[in-house]
A protein has these predicted regions:
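Binding-site signature for planar aromatic cofactors or substrates
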Residues: 18-238
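Residue-level detector of alpha-helix boundary/anchor positions
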Residues: 6-8, 18
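Serine/threonine-rich, low-complexity intrinsically disordered segments
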Residues: 5-6, 28
Length: 238
């Protein structure tokens, strides 16, 4: 267990968390018994920055200092035209001009859903720091120049796979993907251009909630709401 947990978080279940078959194999885990106590820190209105973007940057700096794995991983939730939600993990690639950037295939399920309804919810979970950040906002594509510039920084394999993968489509087997990758490599070599169906989005927040775990489940929840060019801050009951 990492020292950052200081013995308070039960990430590894004990024997009592499992039932066993006669031969000693683990049969199932009693998920309801997995609990943890939140003890690390608090978040008061006096501590919070008036600007939620600056508050996010503060917390993100804490994450980087803690050397957490995949610090920029976030859940991205979208909704279909029929109102069916879907979610997946993507990577934050920048915070600029008050918006949050990520890149993907525009023809993927998330791309198609964002085309129909340009709204999304982002969620960061930093368990080791007992923190979450939820961001609700509208979405727009970044410029082609911005997408070109970021695409050029990606490793060669990642650039080629953007051509090889028709993201979210059904394929017969992995060999189909490997053949498509070889075809992209043969066609473009070491200098693949950016596919027109691949690029970035920016999420422009309308609400940002900061959640800090506290003892006895009396968690701190501060909600920022955009009001014109300013932000209001409200405390939510846990």
């Amino acid at each position: 267990m990492s020292t950052i947990f200081r013995g308070r978080l039960r990430w590894f279940p004990s024997q009592s968390d499992f039932s066993h078959a006669p031969d000693g194999r683990i049969n199932r885990m009693n998920i309801a018994d997995l609990r943890q106590e939140y003890m690390r820190a608090g978040l008061t209105e006096a501590q919070a920055d008036a600007d939620p973007i600056r508050q996010f940057e503060r917390w993100f700096d804490d994450v980087l200092r803690a050397r957490l794995p995949l610090p920029n991983a976030m859940s991205l939730a979208t909704v279909s035209a029929e109102g069916a939600p879907s979610a997946r993990i993507v990577l934050l690639k920048g915070v600029e001009r008050g918006s949050f950037l990520f890149y993907t295939n525009y023809l993927s399920r998330k791309g198609r859903e964002l085309e129909r309804r340009a709204a999304a919810c982002l969620l960061f979970l930093w368990s080791e720091l007992e923190r979450q950040v939820r961001i609700d906002g509208t979405v727009e594509k970044v410029t082609t120049g911005e997408s070109d510039a970021y695409y050029a920084t990606r490793p060669l394999g990642a650039r080629l796979s953007a051509w090889a993968s028709a993201q979210s489509d059904i394929v017969g087997d992995r060999k189909v993907l490997e053949n498509a990758m070889e075809e992209a490599r043969r066609r473009y070599g070491d200098h693949p251009p950016r596919p027109p169906h691949w690029g970035g989005y920016r999420v422009m927040p309308q609400e940002i909630e900061f959640w800090q775990g506290r003892s006895d489940r009396l968690h701190d929840r501060l909600l920022y709401r955009r009001k014109g060019s300013a932000w209001t801050i409200e405390r939510l009951s846990p």
